[in-house]
Design a protein with these regions (language model features):
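Residue-level detector of Asp-centered blade-edge/turn motifs that repeat once per structural unit
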Residues: 19-21, 78-80, 117-119, 162-164, ...
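Bacterial Sec-dependent N-terminal signal peptides
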Residues: 1-18
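Blade-loop segments of beta-propeller domains
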Residues: 51-82, 87-90, 98-113
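Short loop/turn segments immediately following beta-strands, especially the blade-tip
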Residues: 37-43, 179-185, 223-230
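Repeated scaffold domains used in trafficking and secretory/extracellular systems
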Residues: 61-75, 107-117, 152-160, 196-206, ...
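A short beta-strand motif characteristic of beta-propeller blades
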Residues: 47-51, 55-65, 100-106, 144-150, ...
Length: 290
């Protein structure tokens, strides 16, 4: 008789995680990024992998130690093998999970979100800062050298829609759509629409046709084809959503909301209901691996 044993990743600092399993969460805040298996528990014991900037600080210029003090985006990319990280204290990087190697870095003032585009490009949304308030485009092979820049007040969200070949960008009060030029070295603004409410905060992809948009006092579903917003009923009475992820097929909702100021110690989920409490980190965003 053969017995099959399935072992879920449960790592210590000395072990490697080559790829984040589907259904796991990535959370970030302060100078740290965590990978969480929500099926383990609802406290810090659910953390199966963690990274602090100082672990990789010697790989890039020393000044970056000042720029990764408040991480505010931790997006899984490259088939969940890497994490795209931004920090409001002034930088963006691409981190390989297995060896914690920084593969791209750039000074991005008050960066709040980033995403990958075809052609090894990365787009970054920068929020309110004398050198920020912008959308920037970089090549992964050329750290610190933006190849395109557009003004964007209080940039907070960036999402690439691969089916439509469009980049969606969230600012303070508008949602923009860009196309990548044929030469893949610039972006063209296609259209702009006002969002319901002010203080655009998070932008995430539901599917090829819909986006989730959070602002200070509301969360809405944006229909790309119809170009209209509808209230997101599950969070209709919840304010100050900092990050929101919704799987429409399973109805699984995972989000963070400001509770202590702009941060929280909790990650919330529904279907089933769950609250993961991590008291040692000022959590800002959570992302889900699909």
């Amino acid at each position: 008789m053969l017995w099959a044993i399935i072992i879920l990743p449960r790592l210590t600092n000395g072990q490697q995680l080559p790829q984040i399993p589907k259904g796991y969460w990535i959370a970030c805040g302060d100078d740290k990024v965590l990978i969480i298996n929500p099926s383990i528990s609802s406290d810090s014991s659910a953390v199966i992998w963690k990274w602090q900037f100082k672990e990789s600080a010697d790989q890039i210029p020393e000044e970056y130690s000042n720029y990764f003090k408040s991480i505010d985006e931790c997006k899984p990319v490259f088939a969940n093998k890497k994490i795209l990280i931004t920090s409001s204290t002034g930088a963006t990087c691409l981190l390989n999970i297995a060896d914690k190697k920084i593969e791209f870095y750039a000074k991005t003032p008050m960066a709040h979100s980033a995403d990958l585009l075809p052609g090894h490009l990365v787009a970054v949304a920068n929020s309110t800062h004398p050198k920020g308030n912008s959308l920037e485009l970089y090549r992964l092979e050329q750290p610190e050298k933006p190849i395109y820049k557009d003004s964007l007040y209080s940039g907070h969200g960036v999402v690439w829609n691969n089916k439509l070949q469009q980049l969606f960008v969230l600012g303070y009060d508008d949602l923009r759509t860009y196309r990548l030029t044929e030469a893949k070295n610039s972006l063209t603004l296609v259209n702009t629409i006002k969002i319901p409410g002010l203080g655009g905060h998070d932008l995430s992809l539901i599917d090829d046709d819909r986006l989730l948009v959070s602002s200070t006092d509301a969360v809405a579903i944006f229909s790309i084809n119809e170009r209209k917003f509808d209230p997101f009923i599950p969070l209709a009475d919840t304010h100050h959503i900092k990050s929101v992820n919704w799987n429409a097929k399973t109805n699984r909702l995972v989000y963070t909301k400001a509770e202590e100021s702009w941060w929280t110690f909790n990650i919330y989920a529904t279907s089933p209901n769950q609250k993961v409490h991590i008291p040692t980190l000022k959590l800002y965003k959570v992302r889900v691996c699909y």
